[in-house]
Amino acid sequence: MRIKVKVKPGTSKNEVKKIDENLYEVRTTTIPEKGKANEKVVELLSDFFDVPKSKIKIVKGQTSREKEVEVGE
């Protein structure tokens, strides 16, 4: 399944919210430095969808706050 993700780095807590059918908002306490925020986004989505981190892949938007993510099963 492919989803769109809006990332809000540097927030006070880590959370994933479903906004629409294929749109999610991910808030992370991690700052966007050297890919650390992307790693945290993958970890949070992995927990949210209950799949291993290896099944989550950022397809578009590596350096953007708006990303396209592939979630495997």
From Swiss-Prot:
GO (cellular component) term, any one: cytoplasm
Gene3D superfamilies linked: YggU-like
Pfam families per record: DUF167
Positions of disulphide bridges: none
Protein family (similarity comment): Belongs to the UPF0235 family.
Xref: NCBIfam families: DUF167 family protein
PANTHER family, per database record: UPF0235 PROTEIN C15ORF40
Protein name, entry field: UPF0235 protein SYO3AOP1_0257
